[in-house]
Amino acid sequence: MARVLLVEDEITVLILAESVVQELGHSTYSAGSVVQALALLEDPGEIDLLFTDIRLPEGDWGGFEVAEQARRKNPNLKVLYTTADTITDGMKVMFVAGGEMLPKPYTAPELAAASDCAPSSGGVAPDF
């Protein structure tokens, strides 16, 4: 069973993601903001997958910054990003180097498939 940190400011999307990930047999920790996510990352227990929205309502901080903080603690953390924004070529490079991308809107089967294949920063496939 994997431990998954979900970071999403849209409550209905967060509830959907929690439901899908829990249905896959994984435990979830949920944060509706960067502040909540950073507080959860202070817990000594490590997470196996970070699923985070890129754009969060905390000004200059968002999913990339949450992932950066999380990877300071766990450099091999698997990261899955999501956004409803248009993805630029520059952003695509970031995903290749640091995680996978699941664009919004996504379906429950798409989330299930993506959460089972998000690579770590070292390119190792997870064994959830």
Q: Predicted segment positions?
A:
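C-terminal output helix
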Residues: Y106-A118, G123-F128
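Negatively charged, flexible loop motifs adjacent to catalytic sites
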Residues: A84-D89
